[in-house]
Amino acid sequence: MSSIKVMNEILANKINAGEVVEKCVSIVKELVENSIDAGSDDIKIYLKESGLKEIKVIDNGIGMDKEDAILAFQRHATSKLLKEDDLFNINTLGFRGEALPSIAVISEVVLKTTKDNVSTLIHIKGGKLLENTSCEARSGTTITVSNIFYNTPARLKYLKSPYSELANIVDYINKIALSYPNIKFKLVNDDKEL
């Protein structure tokens, strides 16, 4: 009998998520880059306990319709690559379709997005869809990530102190803000603007 087995999808997704999402700054980076790729010129990042408790990113980008909002949480689903030749002309920060599914499998995510005056709410916890409905929302996208690594305790123990997590996020936001001077960034931790 073979000792090598194919992992079930949930376990494989949790392991894969650990490659994309290592700490709080990884989540902030992926969400901010999605906002930039969506054409945002105003991005707000709100943290609770340096991102250890909650990360919320609000943008004024193009938003998503209901179909795209749910597809965004499927692995390898992307609006940025359609064919192999596109790999030679990547003009976006993200393109693999890995970030949102990876974040959603190790946390709880609430996405509110509006496109063409139609707003959608997606609620996912541990990779399981809990809610997919219409809602009231402002234009653009608001995504809230909480309970980070709640179901992967091995990863949870590798998170740094709140001070270290915050320092990494501040460093990333400073660098991305310098790279995109036409975008207004706002970073708030525990109601204190940084």
Regions found by a protein language model. Name each.
Residues 2-194:
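N-terminal phosphate-binding caps/lids of nucleotide- and nucleic-acid-binding domains
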